[in-house]
Amino acid sequence: MIEKVNPSHPDKVADRIAGAIVDLAYAKEDNPKIAVEVLIGHGVCHAIIETTADLDKAEIISAVHRIAGVMDTDIVIVPQDKHLSNNQKDGIRCGDNGIFKGMPLTQEQEELSRIAHDIYGRCPYDGKYIMDGVRLIICQSNVETVDLKRLYSGAEINPLGDWTGGTDVDTGATNRKL
């Protein structure tokens, strides 16, 4: 069984905010050392940032509002630990953050990705899609179930009923859905 979430899922929103904060660090210096964790939901965005860059909280808050809408923000910026920072100087990267990927997708994963992109192109709201062999479960917010049933007649669509989704009803955190 595989699962895919779309760009409006709260975990993906948290990832986009973290990415924007990293971009701000790169705008300040050539090779910043930075680690960002974001937790977002229910009208609040919490971000903890460990960095060598001199970041402006107002710019971070502006990025949060651009990506997720106006909400309360709790931004903590601290200097990166000097030992971690020193470990990052040369070719060997020995920090505590990293994402490694690079495996080929299975046919089932490719099909689910195609379905997820198709649905998100029509309904750009929070959604999750699960495929288990030939069984397809579509959980899509802010859409009439009957409308999706016309497109994917063999799928189980919103098996728990219609729902709203997004960060007003769910919480997202960085690096949970990659």
Where are these regions (language model features)?
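Glycine-rich, mobile lid/loop segments that gate access to catalytic sites or pores
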Residues: H42, G69-N175
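Conserved active-site and cofactor/substrate-binding residues in soluble primary-metabolism enzymes
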Residues: K12, R16, L55, E59, ...
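Short, flexible coil/linker segments at or flanking structured domains
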Residues: M1, A35, G166-D168
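Short, non-transmembrane amphipathic alpha-helical segments
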Residues: I17-A20, A25, A58-M71, D147-Y152
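Short glycine-rich or small-residue beta-strand-to-loop segments that form or flank ligand, phosphate
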Residues: I2-S8, E37, V44-T52, G98-G102, ...
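N-terminal, positively charged regions that mediate nucleic acid binding
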Residues: M1-K33
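Conserved beta-ketoacyl condensing-enzyme motif
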Residues: E29-Q88
